[in-house]
């Protein structure tokens, strides 16, 4: 992994708008193209294979990756076989996958310092004032991205979206990950939504305002997706205790911050609607939306379970079997093209891969 990653990093180049490009490393953007038709913005996002990069989540590989990038020494992590609380803090740190502007860095830092009552020195630990860094870190993939999201057409390993995220353009309202049921062709939510303020007022002390669930396999052991979904939600909640509270709250915090950043970016689009046909405005916005759109990568239920399981609560993960499922995927080294359409009208947002609709997101007000 270390040698292949080093080879991938050596291939990094910059495209015509100064963004880092590496076709074989999914954490580095490949390309984004934009088309504006009336008030609908359509994005074509091409990324490398996702599954081959999940191996980096293993502490040993993650430590190698961090040392290779010269960010910090994580040798102690490599001696353990499960992620600890402080590892989640590392996962939430920005990574140099897509640069952000100083204005974006300052905005994110202000959000952190204001809402979580920390001084600017601590804020610098999370959002460095450096254009090499981006809020699009592993945390974004494992918060927004773990919300179900894609149904893959791979017949040997299908997933169902059992929850979704939405951010209303008119108010700071989040539809957090929640389980859904299908009534014919209609997606019916089975849990309420909460505002970001309500989440942050929770004091980050637990799951009182947030019930975490995640995706599941279809027809695993001949059990319905709904039954698996309920079991998944229970598993996460059972992980909560005094020892795991901080780590779970880190995930919760990142979810709130990612959604708040998404809201700011959507506001920026709404306030500049009359300028959408000007390519000068669309280029920088495309880069920001790419970081949000990367959350639509296919993700695995076992991956999230692995991330949040700080202590062994008799929920054992067969990592050998898990990695076998990941590595056998035909998507390992292929280029995946996804589409994201955002309309300024009231209605639904659709994320699709090729011609198949994979996720329907409905802007909601509480």
Swiss-Prot record:
Q: Which domain of life is it from?
A: Viruses
Q: What is its main location?
A: host cell
> Could you tell me the keywords of this UniProt record?
Host cytoplasm, RNA-binding
Q: State one molecular function term (GO).
A: RNA-directed RNA polymerase activity
List locations, semicolon-separated. Answer: Host cytoplasm
What InterPro entries does this protein's entry cite? Reovirus_polyG_pol
Which region ranges are annotated with the description Important for ssRNA-binding and formation of complexes?
Answer: 1-11
Record-level GO cellular component terms? host cell cytoplasm
Q: Quote additional remarks.
A: There is a strain variablity in the inhibition of the host integrated stress response (ISR). There is a correlation with the abilities of the strains to prevent upstream PKR activation and EIF2S1/eIF2-alpha phosphorylation.
Q: How does it assemble?
A: Homooligomer; in presence of RNA. Interacts with protein mu-NS; this interaction allows the localization of sigma-NS to the viral factories. Interacts with host G3BP1 (via C-terminus); this interaction induces the relocalization of G3BP1 and other SG proteins to the viral factories periphery.
Q: What does this protein do?
A: Protein that binds to ssRNA and participates with protein mu-NS in forming the matrix of viral factories, which are large inclusions in the host cytoplasm where replication intermediates are assembled and viral RNA replication takes place. Plays a role in the inhibition of the integrated stress response (ISR) to escape from host cell translational shutoff. Participates in the disruption of stress granules (SG) through its association with host G3BP1 and mu-NS.
Q: Which family does it belong to?
A: Belongs to the orthoreovirus sigma-NS protein family.
**Full protein name:** Protein sigma-NS
Organism the protein comes from:
Reovirus type 1 (strain Lang)
């Amino acid at each position: 992994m270390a040698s292949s990653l080093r080879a991938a990093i050596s291939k990094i180049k910059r495209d015509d708008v100064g963004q880092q490009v590496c076709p074989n490393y999914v954490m580095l953007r490949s390309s984004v193209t934009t088309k504006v038709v009336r008030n609908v913005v359509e994005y074509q996002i091409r990324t490398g294979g996702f599954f081959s990069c999940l191996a980096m989540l293993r502490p040993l590989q993650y430590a190698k990756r961090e040392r290779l990038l010269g960010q910090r020494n994580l040798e102690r992590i490599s001696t353990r076989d499960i992620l600890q609380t402080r590892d989640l803090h590392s996962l939430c740190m920005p990574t140099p996958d897509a640069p952000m502007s100083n204005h974006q860095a300052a905005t994110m830092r202000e959000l952190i310092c204001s809402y979580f009552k920390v001084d600017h020195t601590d804020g610098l630990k999370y959002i460095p004032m450096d254009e090499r860094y981006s809020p699009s870190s592993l945390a974004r993939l494992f918060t927004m991205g773990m919300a179900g999201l894609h149904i893959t057409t791979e017949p040997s390993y299908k997933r169902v979206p059992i929850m979704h995220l939405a951010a209303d353009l008119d108010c700071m309202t989040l539809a957090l990950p929640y389980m859904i049921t299908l009534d014919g062709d209609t997606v019916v939510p089975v849990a309420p939504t909460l505002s970001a303020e309500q989440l942050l007022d929770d004091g980050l002390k637990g799951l009182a305002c947030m019930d975490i669930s995640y995706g599941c396999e279809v027809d695993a052991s001949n059990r319905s997706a709904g039954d698996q979904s309920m079991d998944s939600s229970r598993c996460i909640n059972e992980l909560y205790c005094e020892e795991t509270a901080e780590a779970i709250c880190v995930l919760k915090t990142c979810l709130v911050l990612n959604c708040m950043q998404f809201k700011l970016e959507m506001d920026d689009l709404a306030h500049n609607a009359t300028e959408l046909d000007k390519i000068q405005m669309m280029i920088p916005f495309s880069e920001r939306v790419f970081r949000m759109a990367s959350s639509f990568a296919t993700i695995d239920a076992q991956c999230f379970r692995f991330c949040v399981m700080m202590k062994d609560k008799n929920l054992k993960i067969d990592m050998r079997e898990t990695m076998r499922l990941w590595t056998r995927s035909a998507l390992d080294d292929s280029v995946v093209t996804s589409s994201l359409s955002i309309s300024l009208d009231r209605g639904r947002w659709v994320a699709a891969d090729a011609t198949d609709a994979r996720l329907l997101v409905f802007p909601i007000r509480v």
